[in-house]
């Protein structure tokens, strides 16, 4: 996969040079290319923003250098183009799974000042990560890349890790423990040390359902639930009413 990122602050992306993203890049599973669209400004000062038509506070990023930068990317017409902006729908795991199927993504980092509305004519979709304000879309772009890389074949050392992570099955992940067996007054649940794989599976599934029911009940509407799951949820619901 190729991911091109249009930004005014390429230095912010140093975080992608570590951990799983770096390993995926080293294995040529993903190629990330940064483009500073300031270099495509026609002004001597390389200014990329200007006053807003109609007046108002703040400056607006011009569409001209953005589109020029976009068109400089080989294969941009066939690539799936994304703008990060609070006007878009909230980014979720389902969207990450969808984007992971593209061979070429282009992400345009929005800016708190706003971008000329005409940029929407040059992108395929807009995404947001929440109802709050960031200085720019750089952090959003990094989050998108990180979430996608985890879904690419061979990017994770253990593919089972992917299927059991929170949200992948529309459930929060079950609680996990490691050594020591006892820390202060807190012990690892006995069932996890029993060696009984079926009991461990049932325990983990029950705890995932319980955690989701209590913390993120909205996810249950989209989860794939078995008859066993529904019985457990009924039990959890009755216990919550006591």
PLM regions and their residue ranges:
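Glycine-rich, flexible N-terminal cofactor/catalytic loop recognition
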Residues: 1-39
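Internal, active-site/partner-interface "lid" segment
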Residues: 139, 151-191
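An accessory alpha-helical subdomain
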Residues: 190-201, 207, 211, 220-228
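Short, structured active-site "lid" loops
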Residues: 48-69
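S-adenosyl-L-methionine/SAH cofactor-binding core of RNA-modifying enzymes
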Residues: 62-109, 116, 153
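Conserved small/polar residues in nucleotide/adenosyl-binding loops
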Residues: 239-242
